[in-house]
Structures are given as structure tokens and as C-alpha cells.
Regions:
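Aromatic-anchored, charged helix-turn/loop surface patch used as a conserved interaction hotspot
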Residues: 25-102, 152-161
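C-terminal non-catalytic interaction appendages of large macromolecular assemblies
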Residues: 91, 95, 99-163
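Charge-rich, low-complexity N-terminal segments
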Residues: 9-32
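Non-catalytic terminal and connector segments of soluble metabolic enzymes
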Residues: 4-11, 21, 44-45, 73-74
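Amphipathic alpha-helical interaction elements
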Residues: 12, 29, 47-48, 115, ...
Length: 163
């Protein structure tokens, strides 16, 4: 697989950040292309070594939760599938308003959106996690967001390799 094909296949693993796929490719990926765990570890290593400014840019590229219901156009296909799979497109009006309010508070406080790997969770679990993290300090949330982005990437890599 050449670099362009790798970027096409894996460029959306980290939200709106195809540069990560390019840098992962440059580390040499031929031996790990069929091993989801090894490929994920390589992506995670490159992401965590990228430095705080680039990490923050990746976090800021993530959509706010429940935006699938709001029909936001900047939502990637992967994010739309994930949010829809968690039922975030089926929020009641009250739940939707909670997400809108918490999204705004969280973003104003931290300068990046609330990020959680929604796969395998329902909207009530996501709302509870959101509520429990609202009062955390920004440094803790930055670390948690990095972990969650890596978890999202792991799910996406596995999905891509399953075909």
C-alpha cells in the first residue's frame, strides 16, 4: 500500500487529521497492516508524541455530542455512525437541550469539546459521564480527552481492517 492509499484508508481515524496517517505511514507500516492492535499502537504513539498544540488541534476537530441530531454538516461519516449508533440522533428535546447546555459549558471552560468514545454506550450513559466530568479541571480533561480519542481511533482502525 502506498502513502496515498494509506491516507485514504486511515486518514479519518483521528478526526479531520489525515496528517497522523501520513506520519504513521512514514514510520513503516507494511508489517502491521493486518494487525489492528499493532497499527493502533503505532497511531497512538505518533499522536501522543505529536506535542500539545497538535493534540489540541485534534481535540478541537472533534464534533460536539448530539450534533448528529442537529444535522451538522461538518460531522464526519465515522462520527455520524458512532453518534447514531449510541442513539444521540434520537435524543428527546430535554436530552438534546442538556447536551447543548453541557457542550457550551464544557467548550467555554476547556477550549475543546467533550470527547468520549460512544461506541457501546447509550445516550443516558453518555449524559451521566458528561455530567460527572463537567467539574474536572482542564488538565485532567485534556488527558481524558486524549485517552478517549485513542479509544475512538482503536474502534475505527478495527472497523477499517474488518472491511
Amino acid at each position: 500500500m502506498d502513502k496515498a492509499a494509506f491516507r485514504t484508508a486511515f486518514g479519518a481515524v483521528y478526526e479531520h487529521s489525515p496528517w497522523l496517517a501520513e506520519e504513521v505511514f512514514d514510520t513503516g507500516v507494511d508489517a502491521i497492516l493486518v494487525d489492528a492492535d499493532a497499527l493502533n499502537a503505532r497511531f497512538e504513539s505518533v499522536f501522543l508524541a505529536a506535542g500539545k498544540p497538535r493534540q489540541l488541534a485534534v481535540l478541537q476537530a472533534h464534533p460536539q455530542l448530539a450534533c448528529a441530531r442537529a444535522e451538522q454538516t461538518e460531522l464526519t461519516a465515522a462520527s455520524r455512525r458512532e453518534q447514531t449508533g449510541a442513539g444521540l440522533d434520537q435524543c428527546t428535546e430535554a436530552e438534546f437541550n442538556q447536551f447543548i447546555d453541557m457542550n457550551e459549558k464544557y467548550m467555554n471552560k476547556n477550549n475543546f469539546p467533550f470527547i468520549i468514545a460512544v461506541k457501546g454506550r447509550n445516550r443516558q450513559q453518555i449524559l451521566e459521564a458528561f455530567k460527572s466530568r463537567l467539574d474536572n479541571d482542564t488538565s485532567s480533561e485534556f488527558q481524558t480527552a486524549l485517552e478517549q480519542v485513542c479509544q475512538i481511533a482503536k474502534f475505527r482502525i478495527k472497523d477499517i481492517l474488518r472491511g
